[in-house]
Amino acid sequence: MIQTQTRLNVADNSGAREVMCIKVLGGSHRRYADIGDVIKVSIKDAVPRGKVKKGDVYNALVVRTRKGVRREDGSLIRFDSNAAVLLNNQLQPIGTRIFGPVTRELRGANFMKIISLAPEVL
């Protein structure tokens, strides 16, 4: 469950380390984002000479949450931290590598590029 002011780790090589959710996209009064949802984020911590810098505002795709995701068979997939992948205005990933596992739920949300870059799909 990601909401406004939530800080997330960045799971790509765009140069950002940590981002903060400033808006959950997809409705005027939508409060929470889950795995596979697009949010608006502000860069809070970045590496020097990266593609992004602190204070920039980007779209991001939530790829891991501590709340997890419930599958049809009743299983629950949960992660140790909240993580997102930075996207440009065309909702394409900014980085060229994805770190850590992502879930199969991204497949139905038209994010096949991120699934193909990920080292592991759960």
From Swiss-Prot:
Domain of life from the UniProt record: Bacteria
One GO process term, biological-process aspect: translation
Pfam families: Ribosomal_L14
A cellular component term, taken from the record's GO annotations: cytosolic large ribosomal subunit
Function: Binds to 23S rRNA. Forms part of two intersubunit bridges in the 70S ribosome.
Subunit architecture: Part of the 50S ribosomal subunit. Forms a cluster with proteins L3 and L19. In the 70S ribosome, L14 and L19 interact and together make contacts with the 16S rRNA in bridges B5 and B8.
Record-given protein name: Large ribosomal subunit protein uL14
UniProt organism field: Acidithiobacillus ferrooxidans (strain ATCC 23270 / DSM 14882 / CIP 104768 / NCIMB 8455) (Ferrobacillus ferrooxidans (strain ATCC 23270))
